[in-house]
Amino acid sequence: MKKFLKALKWLFILVFAILIFSILYIRFTRMTDKIIYQPDDGYEVFESRFNHEELFIPVEKDIRIHAVLFKPTSKPIGTIFHHLGNGMTLINSQLQYEPLINKGFQIFAYERRGFAKSEGKDVNSVILKDDAIIIFDEFLELEAVKNTDVILWGQSLGGAFALVNGAERQDKIKGIIVEGTFNSFPEIGKKFASILNLENFKWVVPLIMNNDFPAEEEIKKINKPIVIIHSISDSQVPFELGQNLFNSSNKSTTEFWKIDGKHINGMDGYEEIYVRKFMELIGK
């Protein structure tokens, strides 16, 4: 009996050690980043029916980020810096821009490293976060952008980028609009665990995921006006995560706009009000 208990004890220690090692390995090799940032086949030529300027912005040696500045036909009333959702390219994101361009906004957007026409490899979230700030700083130096009011716009994962961007450069912006954005990586990870019927293992998600975009912490640092948009029927980022993000914000400067419809599809269903939110941020 003693030998059995001793063997059981060592078996438990071995299993526990393997578990701890596995958690540390997944976390420090950033395996979850490979799940989040899926590669794509890209496309050869960017085309648009809008007036635009195509750019390739260097972020480090031999790596350039593909970006486009979409322009109205008249002098712009303001500039929107759009952080795209995880699977969005400049080909499909521009489908939302027409109402804003028609109002007189110019819109700048880029594709993350290693995705679509951007060069390099999307190694991890930290590098992508650094890229976003470099790109924003370069964007501010564009002649077409100087002396214009700037609004940050982020959708889904892009909303987390926008809030980090806004916290670090809030003196350069008039405000922020995010749609379908979660409050933290671990929280959205736990929701996907539930969807995959892995509820009993939700506890491990915060241990294996690096929370490189702690939106609920970054939003507390921002004193500029923020509009959080979230659909009550969002099947990809549950509505409650948008509520949690709002609960972490400065309520005096943040508006929570509840809509209905598909994930980050607000511009299609609520075009007039959506555009008005941008106009209000620049005092129009």
Question: What are these regions, as identified by a protein language model?
Answer:
Residues 145-156:
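Alpha/beta-hydrolase fold nucleophile elbow
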Residues 215, 224, 238-247:
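Short alpha-helix in the alpha/beta-hydrolase fold that links the catalytic acid
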